[in-house]
Amino acid sequence: SLTRAGLMAGNIMLFGRCWGVMGNYVALYGKQQLGIVDGTGIFFALLSSGLFISRLYGVKGLREGKLAENALEGAVISTVGYTLFALAPGIWAFYASALLIGLGNGRMYPAFLNMFISVARHDQRGTANSSILTSWDVGMGLGILLGGVLSQYLGYSAAFWFTAASQATGTLLILLF
């Protein structure tokens, strides 16, 4: 039954929080803290390139049924990306982290989608699909809200460390699958 997917939903909410913070505040951070006026679009181009590339090389593990392994590998790569972003506030880390986060999320999300669907009965697959999307959306909304509060009162660094910690927590929780 889908009640077994509760831990996975919690993980997806953690990962969605990261995406909510990064996706909404990275351009402001780049402009205000790093002085990148016209280059924040490159961040998103590298992020989407990472997503695309990881979908190409991560599909083999999915076909072999290595869902948790694929999710863990992607989560670790994303954790490195978010941590690099928080740890090294510079232009090179800004762009390198985008590629790493894209590579990780592109590998992690399809694995989670397959795990959600695999715990559902045949007649619950639509519910499983909507459950992962709802979990992601709730996480993103919380990330946008919490990231805004942290950025305003404690600065961007606190928001991005919160993101790295959320990603690391979700990564460790995968070990429970």
Locations of regions flagged by a protein language model:
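Juxtamembrane cytosolic amphipathic helices that cap and anchor the N-termini
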Residues: S1-F15
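Short amphipathic helix-loop junctions that connect adjacent transmembrane helices
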Residues: N24-G39
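Loop-to-transmembrane helix entry/capping segments in MFS-fold secondary transporters
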Residues: V37-D38, H122-I132
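Helix-to-loop junctions at the C-terminal end of transmembrane segments
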Residues: S54-L67, S151
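Structural signature of the two symmetry-related core transmembrane helices
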Residues: E69-L84
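Helix-loop junctions at membrane interfaces in 12-TM secondary transporters
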Residues: A86-S97
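Intracellular juxtamembrane helix-capping segments at the cytosolic ends
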Residues: R107-R121
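A membrane-interface helix-boundary motif in multi-pass transporters
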Residues: V149-Q167
